[in-house]
């Protein structure tokens, strides 16, 4: 027996705002919003598939009073699906991301960005559909 990765919970100051940002990044949509907690996921699986409903993993944003103070110990890597890395970085910066320095050197193939609340993530060079 094993476990499946189904959801990533993210503490934040503005669950709705951060959920909107990540929906734009990933092409996700809001699945549930209740009492300061917002869950987003991929669009529903079309009818006739084996498991109708959101395709995991989902992201759940929960309001917490304290802010982020240190570098993430866990982060997301995203892959552009229909454009080159530099084009995707420009798109994400336009959505509200910013460049982040986590000690990376100039000779790495990924770009480190932070979401509007400072959570670091990487944009990889490889395109994956």
Task: Please provide the spans of the model-predicted regions.
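N-terminal beta-strand motif that seeds the catalytic metal site of vicinal oxygen chelate
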Residues: 1-19, 74, 127-129
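Core segments of cupin and vicinal oxygen chelate
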Residues: 11-56, 94, 107
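Vicinal oxygen chelate
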Residues: 13-15, 76-117
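Short, glycine-anchored, charge-dense loop/turn motifs used at functional sites
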Residues: 22, 117-121
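Active-site beta-strand termini and strand-to-loop segments that position acidic
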Residues: 41-45, 113-116, 126
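Conserved beta-strand in the GNAT
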Residues: 57-62, 112, 121-122
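Short, charged, intrinsically disordered terminal tails
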Residues: 107, 122, 126-129
């Amino acid at each position: 027996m094993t476990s499946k990765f189904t959801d990533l919970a993210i503490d934040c100051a503005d669950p709705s705002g951060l959920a909107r940002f990540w929906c734009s990044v990933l092409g996700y949509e809001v699945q549930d919003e209740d009492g300061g907690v917002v869950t987003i996921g991929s669009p529903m699986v079309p009818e006739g598939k084996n498991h109708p409903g959101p395709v995991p993993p989902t992201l759940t944003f929960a309001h917490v009073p304290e802010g982020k103070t240190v570098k993430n110990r866990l982060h997301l890597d995203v892959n552009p699906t229909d454009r080159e890395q530099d084009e995707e970085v420009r798109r994400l910066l336009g959505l509200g991301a910013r460049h982040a320095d986590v000690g990376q050197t100039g000779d790495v193939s990924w770009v480190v960005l932070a979401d509007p609340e400072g959570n670091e993530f990487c944009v990889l060079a490889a395109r994956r559909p």
